[in-house]
Amino acid sequence: MAAPSLSTPFQPYVYQSPQAAVTAFQILGGEAQILQIMLKPQEKVLAKSGTMCYTSGSIQMENVLPPENGGGLWQWFFGKNVINTSFVNSGSQDGFIGLAAPSLSRILPIDLATFGGEIICQPDAYLCSLNDVTVTTTVNRRPRPGIFGGEGILRQKLVGRGLAFIAAGGSVVQKNLAQGEVLVVDAACLVAMSSTIDFHVKYGSSARRPVFGGDGLLTAHLTGPGIVFIQSLPFYRLSQRIARAVTSPNVRDNPRFFVQIGIFFFLAYIMIVSSLLLTDV
């Protein structure tokens, strides 16, 4: 495998695949990692489009629509990217490929065989997979009826006995839940979990939040047994910070500025109308 080469004396953190692994790989770097996979002749890796950084000369690329993605056409109609990229080593010698997530992420290797052949993850978490892995987007975890904001939670399932790689923002914590153990997580920080875990989501907000501010967390209540992966910096949270930094000072300092102005004028209107009515009387 090609060794990482830098012009500085600081070598990146390297996670080496276990010696018993069928396909050798390395995870390079710290906060924005690169996955480097060694491919034997005719060996293939399936990756999300737009994740390739570099390859050896023997690697051939092809855009494919996974046949198991039954809802792909419907997602494409609403602007979703449903095309994956297949990378095949067409040479007679070993080759390599470097993949990375489109945001600041750490990369987690997931051996599906150790998870009972199935894991559920956020739709943007999947990076690539090797061997026997099927990626579907038919899972749609919603909150109980009447709870607002539950769409889009853990809508992707990875099934098979192969090796998958998922990306998570910031630092990653793994929690092993015992039978009946409960864990409450911000839904945006939930990356992936075992399919054996039962959970529901709640929207913990109040009518005062749009006016006075505060967190309105969409929380996931998880009940074991199973394994949970939690990220410290979801891309949604990072994008909100960036958006606030590039907006005008009034909106940046108080995102609910326009709501408060609207309420002020509404109350002023009520006071004026009331004074006119009292004057007529």
Stretch-by-stretch model annotation:
Residues 2-281:
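Composition-driven recognition of glycine/serine/threonine/acidic- and proline-rich low-complexity segments
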